Amino acid sequence: MNDIQVAKESLDKIIKKARVHLYKPIQIAEILYQDRVNKNINLLDKETYRNISKKWRDVICIRFLGRVSTSSAKYQDDLFNDNAMPPKHLNILGEMNRKTNGGVESYIYKKFFERFNQMSSALEYSYSRTPDNFHLSEFLALFWLEPGLKRSIDKVYEIVVYALFSSLIEALGVKVKIDLDLSNIDLLKEFEDFTRQIISLDSENTSLELNAKINRVGVTNASDRGLDMWANFGMAIQIKHLSLTEELAENIVSSVSSDRIVIVCKESEEKLILSLLNQIGWRSKIQSIITEADLIKWYDKALRGKSAYLVGSKILEHIRNEINLEFPATDIVDFNHFFHEREYNKALDIEK
C-alpha cells in the first residue's frame, strides 16, 4: 500500500473501533478542518493541536450529542500513537483533505451520521414495543448483528440490567434500615454534627429507613473495568460481556471496594470467570454471577408473567429513559445545516 492508503486505513480502523459517539474520529475531523480553513496548526507537530483539538471536538459533541468524552487524558491522547493516527498519517490526510475541499472531513461526518441512523433503527425497537412483544434476545441482537453498533453493546447491557434490577427492587418494596449502636453513645455525642450531616442520624433519631435503590455510574470506561452500578444496600454490579483475562478479572475485583460483587456475563464466559476468580483468590468477593440466559428468563417473566402488571411497563420506561441519556438523538435538521454550512456537500469523494 502507498502512504495515502495506509493513512486512510488508519482512519477507517479508528472509525470501526469507535463507540457510537465517535469522539476520536470527530477530533480528527476538527483538526483537519482547522488545518484547511484557519491554517493555524502544523499537522506534523502534534503539540500544536493535541490539547486544543479536544475543545474543538467538544464543541461538535455538545452540539450533536449533548455530551463530551469522559475518558482519561491518557486514553484520549492515545489517538496520536503510532498504532492509531500518528502525525505523519494525519499530515497525509490533511493534504488529501485540502485537495478535496474537505473530503476527509465530509467522509468522517458521513460515517458519524450513518452510525446514528443505525442506532436510531435499533433503538426504535424499545419505543415501538410493549411488554407483550418486547423480547430481550431480539433487542440485544440488533446491536450484536450491526457492526457499527457492536462497540456500544456494553452500555446496552448496563441499561437492560439496570432497568430490570431497579424495577424489581422498587416493585418488591425493598427497604434499607440504618441503626446507630447506642453502646457508643459518648462517641455519638462527640461527633453528633458529623452523624447528623453525613448519615442524617443523631442521639434523638437513631434509625433511618430508606427505599432500596440501584444506581448506574453512567460514565464510559475506556478500559472496561471497575464499577458499572452500585446499590445503597452494599452491592456492586459489574457488567462483563467481552472475553475475560486473568489480569482483567483481577482489575475488576480489585478496583471495586465491595465484598458483594455481582457479575453479569454471557453463558460461555461463566465457567471461565469462576475459574479465573478462583485462581486469583477473589471468589469469596463475588456474591453471584448472572448470565444472559438468566436475564432473558427474568425479562420474560417480568414482561409477560403473573406479575407483569407490576413491573412490565416500568422496565420499558427505564430502558427508554436510560437510552435517551446514553444515546441522545442527533437533530437531523441541525446536522444537515452544519453539513451544508461547511460545504461538505461540495467536497470531493475520497473513496473515488
UniProtKB/Swiss-Prot annotation:
Its EC number is 3.1.21.4
Q: What does the record list as GO biological process?
A: DNA restriction-modification system
| UniProtKB keywords | Endonuclease, Hydrolase, Nuclease, Restriction system
Q: What class of enzyme is it?
A: hydrolase
Query: GO MF terms on file?
Result: type II site-specific deoxyribonuclease activity
Q: Does the keyword Hydrolase apply?
A: yes
The record's section on InterPro entries has: Restrct_endonuc_II_HaeII
Q: Which reaction does it catalyse?
A: Endonucleolytic cleavage of DNA to give specific double-stranded fragments with terminal 5'-phosphates
Instruction: Spell out the protein name for this chain.
Output: Type II restriction enzyme HaeII
**Which species is this UniProt entry from?**
Haemophilus aegyptius
Q: What is the lineage of its organism?
A: Bacteria, Pseudomonadati, Pseudomonadota, Gammaproteobacteria, Pasteurellales
The encoding gene: haeIIR
